[in-house]
Every structure is written in structure tokens, then in C-alpha cells.
């Protein structure tokens, strides 16, 4: 979940993240508890805003945060230091294949990406321009040492990777039997070249056996009011209780 941009940056076509309502976030925490999640994996943790919000809303379970940008990870480590159930992984990016990649670090840290910005994003958010590039190791999530060694059996995976969610999800295939839920950033318009659109991401999640459960508002373009991104929460079909399955709809 993202920090609200300073209103001074909301002029013109700059992006303004819609403040995510407390009620959907509380529903998410309730969902974690009902699904008996024993580990939340926060991929693309930035400064730890997502984990901090879960804690604020009462989630007391284990959290593993993953962030490749050194200064953000250092801040994340400091933030998690007083919480024995909150761990920070090694500084890596997540992808479908191990290797190294160039991360384009944005002036807006939560807009940093392994993918190039689209012309639309360049026009909408000049402040998201890259200010430097760094080489980062890329690992598959199912090969991440902190997860390979983890005893967790009911993992909730959140991916907020600025267009790289599809690749990271592919790299989590070996963990899918242990992943009961997903939270994926969904782009309603193309903001990063090569990213999967929202329809393709939902199709991908469903093909892996996860059903849409909850949607959280994301970025809007302030001049038009058009929503540009949202978060989709998905539950593994066989992890959903019988009474809850009965309320599902196949409407598209």
C-alpha cells in the first residue's frame, strides 16, 4: 500500500495515489486471519508501509519483507528491528529466472522498476523519472533461502513490483502448494513497457487456481479521475471454506 503523494505534486498530469480506504484494508487483515495465514511475504516492500499497516490493523503473524534498493532496505531493517515476527530478506529482486538485472530507481521510490516506463507514464508522472540505475541480483521466489528454510505452510504473497508481478509470480511456482492467497498490483492502463495488463494478471491467477476475492483502490489520474492501478486479492480455491465458495459468481 502506497504513501499519498504530496499534494504539491498533484498538479497537471502527475499521478496521485488514492488513499486506500481503511475498510478494505481491515477486510484484508480479517481474510488473513480466516485463511489461517502463517506468513505474509511482502514483495516490493519499499520502506515497509504495507507491513506497518498490517500491524496497525491488528495482524500479528509473521512477515517477510523483500526490497532490493539498498537505502530503502536499510530503512526497512530499522523499522522491523523491534518486531521479532517481522524479518527482512537479502536485497534481491524477484523474477522468473535467476540472474542480474538493471533496476531503474525512480525519484519516486515506489515507482522504481526493472521495466522501462511507458510513454503514458512519462506524460502522467514526470516525477517518476529514473534518477539512477543499479545492478541487482534476481532470484526466483521459490529459491529464496528465507522461504526455502521457512516452516510456513499457509503463505500470503503480496507482489507490488511496478510491472514485474507476472515474472515474479512465475518464479513462485514451486511455492504454490504453500501459497493460499495472493495480492497483485493490477494495471488498468500500461504504465511500464512489457507488463501484464489487469485482465491477463487475473487470468494468470485463476489459471494457477486462485479466485478473485477483494479489490483495493490504487492510483488515479487527478485531472480525469480515472483509476490507473488497483490491487487484486486472490484466494486459492481449495483454501476457501465451503460456505464461502457457495457465494462465488462466475460472471465475467
Question: Where in this protein do the model-derived segments appear?
Answer:
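Phosphate/nucleotide-binding beta-alpha loop and adjacent structural elements of enzyme active sites
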Residues: 1-252
Amino acid at each position: 500500500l502506497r504513501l499519498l503523494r504530496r499534494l504539491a505534486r498533484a498538479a497537471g498530469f502527475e499521478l496521485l495515489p488514492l488513499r486506500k480506504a481503511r475498510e478494505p484494508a481491515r477486510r484484508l487483515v480479517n481474510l488473513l486471519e480466516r485463511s489461517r495465514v502463517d506468513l505474509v511475504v511482502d514483495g516490493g516492500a519499499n520502506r515497509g508501509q504495507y507491513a506497518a499497516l498490517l500491524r496497525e490493523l491488528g495482524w500479528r503473524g509473521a512477515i517477510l519483507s523483500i526490497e532490493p534498493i539498498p537505502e530503502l532496505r536499510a530503512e526497512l531493517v530499522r523499522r522491523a528491528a523491534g518486531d521479532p515476527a517481522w524479518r527482512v530478506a537479502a536485497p534481491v529482486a524477484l523474477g522468473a529466472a535467476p540472474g542480474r538485472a538493471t533496476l531503474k530507481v525512480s525519484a519516486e521510490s515506489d515507482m522504481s522498476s526493472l521495466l522501462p516506463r511507458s510513454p503514458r507514464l512519462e506524460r502522467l508522472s514526470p516525477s517518476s523519472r529514473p534518477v539512477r540505475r543499479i545492478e541487482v541480483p534476481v532470484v526466483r521466489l521459490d529459491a529464496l533461502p528465507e522461504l526455502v528454510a521457512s516452516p510456513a505452510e499457509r503463505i500470503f504473497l503480496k507482489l507490488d513490483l511496478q510491472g514485474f508481478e507476472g515474472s515474479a509470480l512465475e518464479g513462485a511456482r514451486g511455492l504454490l502448494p504453500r501459497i493460499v492467497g495472493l495480492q497483485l498490483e493490477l494495471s488498468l492502463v500500461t504504465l511500464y513497457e512489457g507488463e501484464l495488463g489487469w485482465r491477463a494478471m487475473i487470468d494468470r491467477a485463476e489459471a494457477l487456481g486462485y479466485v478473485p476475492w477483494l479489490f483495493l483502490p490504487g492510483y488515479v489520474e487527478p485531472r480525469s479521475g480515472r483509476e490507473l492501478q488497483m490491487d487484486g486479492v486472490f484466494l486459492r480455491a481449495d483454501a476457501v471454506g465451503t460456505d464461502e465458495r457457495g457465494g462465488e459468481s462466475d460472471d465475467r
